[in-house]
Amino acid sequence: MNKVSFLTLGCKVNQYETEAMQELFKKRGYEICNENDICDVYVINTCTVTNLSDRKSRQFISRAKKLNKDAILAVVGCYSQVAPDEISAIEDVDVIIGTKNRARIVELCEESKKSNLKFNIVSELTKDCGFDVLSIENQESKTRAYIKIQEGCNMFCTYCIIPYARGPIKSRPIDDIYEEAVKLANNGYKEVIITGIHVGSYGLDLGNDTRLIDVIEKLSTIENLDRIRLSSIEAGIISKDFLIRLKNCKKVCEHFHLSLQSGCDKILKLMNRRYTTDMYRKKVRMIKEIFPNVALTTDIIVGFPGENDEDFQETLNFVKEIGFSKIHVFKYSKRKGTPAFDFKEQVDGNVKKFRSNELILLAKDMTTEFLKKELSEKHEVLFEENINGNRLVGYTRNYIRFSAPYNEDMKNKVVYCNGISVEGEEIFGLASKIKI
């Protein structure tokens, strides 16, 4: 039996696409192995969000061929898309695929092995490319599964290379999304997480009225699916109508990852984020009015070019006002090929580090406060992971990591639980009743 291993860099979308490519290899009889095993094929699914990501991609490309000099080495993904010539210059690479045509990966790897030829099928991404369908029936996690519903982004934030790596928005047909979700539910998955590059733009390219909310409403009709969770969305999609329709879909989780990036209007404008803090504030109020028990998580970039101490303080103040349950903090990293790369007033590295540490400390305090507030609530927990044989860990509907004493009967079940204590960034508690 031929063996293949995958190494994946980057986001949840990349992880989804890796698992989809793994299924393609499995269907051709390949054994999926560890990245450090001796294999016949190595696939590096690359990331290009920062220059560091590019460097890591090159390092892993170099390492893979050293494991087996006779293996086929395929490099796919975002770095391949934006820098195919750089990858072509690496002698050991046999197959180069960008962010489309990944369904051909098995065919190209086998043809390369047979003919001793190299293949580079990276081509320009246009709005006419269509959605590159990669679907999954089984994922590594047996409780929660990702479903990719769209590709690409038209927003062009000044710090972001992704619109160039992923191309214009391309929406997956709604019936295809539904069919994949049905298969996942039939295979025992209790929760699906809707993901994509810019999820809120779903449907804008279809030439009809189908939008993200229509996808959610259709998935909510799947009888043996208990939960639907949204990945990252933007403030612009939030409206009263959208939220009311979400609320009526009883399976939608009370958790919104609402990307912020900065709490300073000056910086938001420099980033080309297309909203103000006042608009964001109003959207949050709408959410909390309709989903009182909601968890709000976000991303923030510190040290963006032009950000001074007063601007950063505005971000700190705004973060406190909103009351996030969790914040992912990133230090701005220059990315060649983006407008911000050439911006003046680049922030010193030590200043970025200081601001990052300060925001991380604030974020930890906010997470603790949120968890303490949630201790008195009764939670539905989908248990999925066994920790050291004595605890099960899972997530509540509002995305709190929750642990309880191990009980085999609760694994991959939704269980009503009561919290006892806050332990770091999770709640420990006891089960009261299995829901499903």
Question: Where are the regions a protein language model picked out?
Answer:
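Proteins enriched for Cys/Gly/acidic motifs involved in redox and nucleic-acid/cofactor modification
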Residues: 1-202, 256, 278-289, 313, ...
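Short, solvent-exposed loop/turn segments at secondary-structure boundaries
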Residues: 53-55, 168-175, 203-209, 270-273, ...
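Conserved SAM/AdoMet-binding glycine-rich loop
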Residues: 73-74, 82-83, 87, 186-309, ...
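Short, hinge-like loop/turn segments at secondary-structure boundaries
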Residues: 91-93, 112-115, 210-212, 246-247, ...
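Short flexible coil/turn linkers enriched for glycine and charged/polar residues
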Residues: 140-143, 153-155, 252, 262, ...
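Hydrophobic, well-ordered secondary-structure elements that form the walls
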Residues: 258, 299, 319, 327, ...
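Short glycine-rich, low-complexity segments
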Residues: 325, 338-342
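Terminal RNA-binding accessory module
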Residues: 342-436
